[in-house]
Amino acid sequence: MKAGLTRRQVLDRTEKRAFVEFLADVFGSTSMVVVTQNKGLTVADVTELRRRIRAAGATYKVAKNRLASRALDGTQFDGIAPLLKGPTALAWSEDPASVAKVIVEFAKTNDKLVVLGGALGSQALGVDGIKALAELPSLDELRAKLVGMINTPATRIAGVVQAPAGQLARVFGAYAKAGEAEAA
């Protein structure tokens, strides 16, 4: 073990191999990866960032660059390997917009988190690409809009179909009242 490091800070070969396999599985099953530089973030900052990312259904992991590069080899995200320099962390999610939104919003309020880039599928994205992705609505927002658009015509048709029946009922009601008034 290296001098000055605790057992927890040094990974043995089997742990490294398991971590590379874990990341390779993640990169094989996710649609979006964002690479950030987290130099100078406090524990409280990282905890808050992880909480926000978890709430968005994403994951944030600090990884050794060499191990992350090995995990990237042969995956659709291997184009982001050059971004892995310095103290970096990876965030990933199935919903591309959600992870990008959380990272970009957090970076606006905390200048110690720097977005380096990322990838959406096999397409490598720069900082501007990640920021543009953050402007898009999330999958849940898109689903809600789609359901609303699908329901709107049905609601209008139901309103049109019900309107004549209501009008007829009012006309019959008026005739009935008029007939009662004449009979009295």
Swiss-Prot record:
Q: Which GO terms describe its biological process?
A: translation
Any one Pfam family here would be Ribosomal_L10
Q: Which residues form a coiled coil?
A: none
A GO cellular component annotated for this chain's UniProt record is: ribosome
| Ribosomal protein listed as a keyword | yes
UniProt keyword annotation of rRNA-binding present: yes
Gene Ontology MF terms in the entry: large ribosomal subunit rRNA binding
This protein's UniProt keywords: Ribonucleoprotein, Ribosomal protein, RNA-binding, rRNA-binding
What is the superkingdom listed in this entry's lineage?
Bacteria
Which SUPFAM superfamilies does the record cross-reference, listed alphabetically? Ribosomal protein L10-like
Q: Which HAMAP family match?
A: Ribosomal_uL10
Describe its assembly. Part of the ribosomal stalk of the 50S ribosomal subunit. The N-terminus interacts with L11 and the large rRNA to form the base of the stalk. The C-terminus forms an elongated spine to which L12 dimers bind in a sequential fashion forming a multimeric L10(L12)X complex.
Describe the function of this protein.
Answer: Forms part of the ribosomal stalk, playing a central role in the interaction of the ribosome with GTP-bound translation factors.
Q: Which family does it belong to?
A: Belongs to the universal ribosomal protein uL10 family.
Name assigned to this protein: Large ribosomal subunit protein uL10
Q: Which organism is it from?
A: Gluconobacter oxydans (strain 621H)
